[in-house]
Amino acid sequence: MASWGIETIGLLAGVLGIVAWGPQLRQVWVEGRHDGISLPTFAIVTVALVLWLVYGLLVDSVAMVLANTVTIAIIAAIIVGVVRLRRAEGSP
């Protein structure tokens, strides 16, 4: 398969991966709910995404770099929102 075809598949996967976090971002920032969100799980996912980002940089994959950078930003926003909500409620 041509290089552009492989990168296109990566971009499509990246877009779907980004969109997948939308419902939780909405739950936290629009609905103001944090139930069911595990911060330790988000921390592990963030570490995995950073490693994928580094890998993408090393293999020069635009799709991996873009998708993981945007996803890390979205997850950071979710984590910040959850921490703010929990502090406002006085829960750990």
What are these regions (language model features)?
Residues M1-P92:
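Alpha-helical membrane-protein topology signature
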